[in-house]
């Protein structure tokens, strides 16, 4: 009888250890899902036609001077949907100089994303948006050479190459 009680106690301890392991795993999965939801990782439009990459480039307006391009330009049809690359809050929505119709989203982990040259905007400052939600439509507003989306990613206020997150 003592052997059975000892075995039962041992099995109970093993079950409690497995339960703790599963709870830790569940916590890790939830944290990873949260990180993925609020980190820019969704390509912001249906086209993958990058016409201007992040970094140094020849100025597309004069064809010879060099300039720094803080994002990627993605050619697409005028009016194609633009999606939030991660869940977050709309920090800015409206006209923003050379960016034309522009949206800036704030995300967790210090990330912000910016979307420029749109034809129309469908979200307002202060609004919460989910990853993949339509926030506007591709256009050619502002200082632009044709219909495309200008897309930027910043982390803690510093420009980063969007390609490393997509």
Residue ranges and their predicted role:
Residues 42-166:
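Catalytic cores of peptidoglycan-degrading enzymes
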């Amino acid at each position: 009888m003592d052997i059975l009680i000892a075995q039962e106690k041992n099995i109970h301890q093993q079950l409690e250890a497995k339960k703790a392991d599963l709870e830790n795993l569940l916590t890790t999965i939830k944290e990873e899902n949260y990180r993925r939801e609020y980190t820019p990782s969704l390509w912001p439009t249906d086209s993958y036609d990058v016409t201007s990459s992040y970094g140094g480039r020849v100025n597309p307006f004069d064809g010879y001077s060099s300039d720094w391009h803080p994002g990627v330009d993605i050619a697409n049809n005028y009016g194609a949907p633009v999606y939030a690359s991660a869940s977050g809050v709309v920090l800015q929505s409206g006209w923003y100089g050379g960016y034309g119709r522009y949206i800036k989203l704030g995300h967790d982990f210090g990330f912000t994303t910016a979307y420029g040259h749109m034809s129309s905007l469908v979200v307002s400052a202060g609004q919460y948006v989910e990853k993949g939600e339509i926030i506007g439509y591709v256009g050619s507003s502002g200082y632009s050479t044709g219909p495309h989306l200008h897309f930027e990613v910043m982390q803690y206020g510093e420009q980063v190459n969007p390609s490393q997150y997509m």
